[in-house]
From Swiss-Prot:
Gene assigned in the entry: FOXJ3
Function: Transcriptional activator of MEF2C involved in the regulation of adult muscle fiber type identity and skeletal muscle regeneration. Plays an important role in spermatogenesis. Required for the survival of spermatogonia and participates in spermatocyte meiosis.
Protein name, UniProt field: Forkhead box protein J3
Polar residues biased stretches: 249-273, 316-331, 358-379
Xref: SMART domains: FH
Entry keyword Acetylation: no
The species this protein was found in: Homo sapiens (Human)
GO molecular function, one term: RNA polymerase II cis-regulatory region sequence-specific DNA binding
Pfam families named in the record: Forkhead (PF00250)
């Protein structure tokens, strides 16, 4: 018996311990602990144990009231009810089943004298229970019921307890972890920065065709070391200046180099922007510059309609061309260049053809695009500071055939600097092809390459070249009497709003080719290459290469160190002594050019180390 009596308590304790552990570790009962389940459980408890114990759970029964017998039992001591139960008793005792906070306080003090002397801490507990307990509902006063404070009532249908759920982790996508230099970065966004300047600069993003307004009221001393510190290959942008003269479009492409970049149309306008290298790989089909067409049409109306109205189609006044609605400037002024006239195009031109560029026989500098001709010209009222570069470079489009396009040979009073001609760009889809802008090497490192890289037509350098060549045109020296067919075809194109089909455009390209052949602008490829290499090795050699067609090399000679621009850029020769000598040398150079064979003019173009030359004959796909 002794052993049995000792074993029974141990067995009982083990059973109780196992039940306790199972109840503590098992959480199956937790979801079932809702308000309704608690109310039903309280009803069962009330039926089993009587009314005394159920009053302690009065909170769980919204209809519970307090009997006077119980009031008398707990009159002397602290009542065995929770604050929620006291609130329930108070509200249910009201005929309207609602009470204000002060009325609840008063009811508790009247029925339980303990709380009269218990201080004010219990009142805070009453307020907390009213606010936090789901069983109590706040009822606002009606307008016809004067008084202070809202009513409190018992919610007979409390909301079920919602089981807390673990928040799901947000899946990380690989696409979100993009680098700051990805194609989706904000560098293509081109935020619109509008300042109080009277003439902002409209910059066209060549990738997204977004338009950005930049403040053009910048200090003229800004250096590309701070604003344009990337390489030349990273610079390609056409900035459209909206001037106040009608619908004036001034295209000012900006490039960077070791010297300062300044003045466009006015000294206050300096659009500068960088485009990453990846933008250059996009095809020209993504460009859509509608303003270029409007610019060309305005130029045509201002210059060529006036010339057509004259009998001889010649002697266009310089004033009329200066008042042209199209003002296209492409300027670069090294810090040491002779630059005294801010409105003239006297700066040495920073373009990809600085040290000589290579274009294949049918692909010369101005890539002719199809349907929106753009003609850029701004006459230079200061001839000694007219920009000088390579001879005119015609660019035939992939559709060669028989019709002139307006690329006039512009006469210049200087013997070594034939004025650049105009470049008309057309594209069938109203989009404009452009040239890649690459940093030219120093003149001592010029090599005779004969190819064009695959990104030659990928960026805005064609626009830059056309702006550069047409920027210093002196229209008073132009003789268009021998190119009446060209003028007529241009007039017909203008009548058709420049909506040319392929055949008409091919005619224009063919006439353009004939025009440059007759004017001597298309020179021998071998001679040009030979002179580019030879002249680059001897930049100070006397001007005996004028007749060879390599006028760019000849223009670099006999310059003092103070006037030397950075390597790879055309130099501004000093003003020659007399106009007579100038004109004589100029005519001699022109006559020698006319005697050159009409072969494709080759220019050298500096290529990056990883660039691949494009030797494909684009005329073969026509």
């Amino acid at each position: 018996m002794g052993l049995y009596g000792q074993a029974c308590p141990s067995v009982t304790s083990l059973r109780m311990t196992s039940e306790l552990e199972s109840s503590l570790t098992s959480m199956d009962w937790l979801p079932q602990l809702t308000m309704r389940a608690a109310i039903q459980k309280s009803d069962a408890t009330q039926n089993a144990h009587g009314t005394g114990i159920s009053k302690k759970n009065a909170l769980l029964d919204p209809n519970t009231t307090l009997d006077q017998e119980e009031v008398q039992q707990h009159k002397d001591g602290k009542p065995p009810y929770s604050y929620a139960s006291l609130i329930t008793f108070a509200i249910n005792s009201s005929p309207k089943k609602k009470m204000t906070l002060s009325e609840i306080y008063q009811w508790i003090c009247d029925n339980f004298p303990y709380y009269r002397e218990a201080g004010s801490g219990w009142k805070n507990s009453i307020r907390h229970n009213l606010s936090l307990n789901k069983c109590f509902l706040k009822v606002p006063r009606s307008k016809d019921d004067p008084g202070k404070g809202s009513y409190w009532a018992i919610d007979t249908n409390p909301k079920e307890d919602v089981l807390p759920t673990r928040p799901k982790k947000r899946a990380r996508s690989v696409e979100r972890a993009s680098t700051p230099y990805s194609i989706d970065s904000d560098s293509l966004g081109m935020e619109c920065i509008i300042s109080g300047s009277a003439s902002p600069t409209l910059a066209i993003n060549t990738v997204t065709n977004k338009v950005t307004l930049y403040n053009t009221d910048q200090d003229g001393s800004d250096s590309p070391r701070s604003s344009l510190n990337n390489s030349l290959s990273d610079q390609s942008l056409a900035s459209v200046n909206l001037n106040s003269v009608g619908s004036v479009h001034s295209y000012t492409p900006v490039t960077s180099h070791p010297e300062s970049v300044s003045q466009s149309l006015t000294p206050q306008q300096q659009p500068q922007y960088n485009l990453p290298e990846r933008d250059k790989q996009l095809l020209f089909s993504e460009y859509n510059f509608e303003d270029l067409s409007a610019s060309f049409r305005s130029l045509y109306k201002s210059v060529f309609e006036q010339s057509l109205s004259q009998q001889g189609l010649m002697n266009i006044p310089s004033e009329s061309s200066q008042q042209s609605h199209t003002s296209c400037t492409y300027q670069h002024s090294p810090s040491s260049t002779v630059s005294t006239h801010p409105h003239s195009n006297q700066s040495s031109l920073s373009n990809s053809h600085g040290s000589g560029l290579n274009t294949t026989g049918s692909n010369s500098v101005a890539q002719v695009s199809l349907s929106h001709p753009q003609m850029h010209t701004q006459p230079s009222p200061h001839p000694p500071h007219r920009p000088h570069g390579l001879p005119q470079h015609p660019q035939r489009s992939p559709h060669p055939a028989p019709h002139p396009q307006q690329h006039s040979q512009l006469q210049s009073p200087h013997p070594q600097h034939p004025s650049p001609h105009q470049h008309i760009q057309h594209h069938p889809n109203h989009q404009h092809q452009t040239l890649t802008h690459q940093a030219p090497p120093p003149p001592q490192q010029v090599s005779c390459n004969s190819g064009v890289s695959n990104d030659w037509y990928a960026t805005l350098d064609m626009l830059k070249e056309s702006c550069r060549i047409a920027s210093s045109v002196n229209w008073s020296d132009v003789d268009l009497s021998q190119f009446q067919g060209l003028m007529e075809s241009m007039r017909q194109a203008d009548l058709k709003n420049w909506s040319l089909d392929q055949v008409q455009f091919a005619d224009l390209c063919s006439s353009l080719n004939q025009f440059f052949t007759q004017t001597g602008l298309i020179h021998s490829q071998s001679n040009v290459q030979q002179n580019v290499c030879h002249g680059a090795m001897h930049p100070t050699k006397p001007s005996q290469h004028i007749g060879t067609g390599n006028l760019y090399i000849d223009s670099r000679q006999n310059l003092p160190p103070s006037v030397m621009p950075p390597p790879g850029y055309p130099h501004i020769p000093q003003a020659l002594s007399t106009p007579g000598t100038t004109m004589a040398g100029h005519h001699r150079a022109m006559n020698q050019q006319h005697m050159m064979p009409s072969q494709a003019f080759q220019m050298r173009r500096s290529l990056p180390p990883d660039d691949i030359q494009d030797d494909f004959d684009w005329d073969s796909i026509v």
